[in-house]
Amino acid sequence: MTDKLIIRRTIAEELAQILALYPLAFPDEELRPVVSRLIEGEAQVLSLATFKGEALVAHVLFTIFGSEEDKGAGALLAPLGVVPDHQGQGVGNALVKDGLKRLGAMGVRQVFVFGDPAYYGRFGFKTERQVLTPYPLSEEYGDDAWQSMPLAGRAPLAAGRMSLPEPWMEPALW
């Protein structure tokens, strides 16, 4: 019998499992400090994980924020990690879709991501030019890597710079 995949909000006791996932999913990046600070800190986040039995096989973090010009709710999708033996099986897709649905129910108006346009475009993300990141972006995915998507027909955030919690205020993260 195979274990069914379950997506749910994480709890504080699962932080060690969450942090163990990221070096496997991103061996060339050190994401554990920002993930830990966001989950344990005072930032408003939506932390979701996919479990296969007791094993955490994927995690996504959405940080809720406003912008300089608009205090309306936006969310930053980052990071999203899937353990290597579950990549390419739709686990990340299901996790993102679940998160977008939950964010819509929470009243979030627009979700932002910095990543591969081919991957995130399948969810409806499009290049973003109005709401700016706190620091210049790396050239990893080109000019179209900064993307956003309004939720449930809601109006997008006003143009301006994102106002993110302190853990995201590290230039190296961008």
Which residues does each PLM region occupy?
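Conserved active-site alpha-helix within GNAT-family acetyltransferase domains
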Residues: 105-109, 115-142
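Conserved beta-strand segments that form the floor/walls of ligand-binding pockets within enzyme
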Residues: 49, 61, 76, 81, ...
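A short, glycine- and basic residue-enriched loop/turn
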Residues: 68-69, 74, 117
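Conserved acetyl-CoA-binding loop-helix of GNAT-fold acetyltransferases
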Residues: 77, 82, 88-101, 113
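A short beta-loop-alpha structural element at the N-terminal edge
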Residues: 5-18
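Active-site rim helix/loop that mediates acceptor-substrate recognition in acyltransferases
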Residues: 15, 20-53, 57-66
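C-terminal "cap" of GNAT-fold acetyltransferases
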Residues: 135-174
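Conserved glycine-rich acetyl-CoA-binding loop
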Residues: 55, 69-70, 83-94, 106, ...
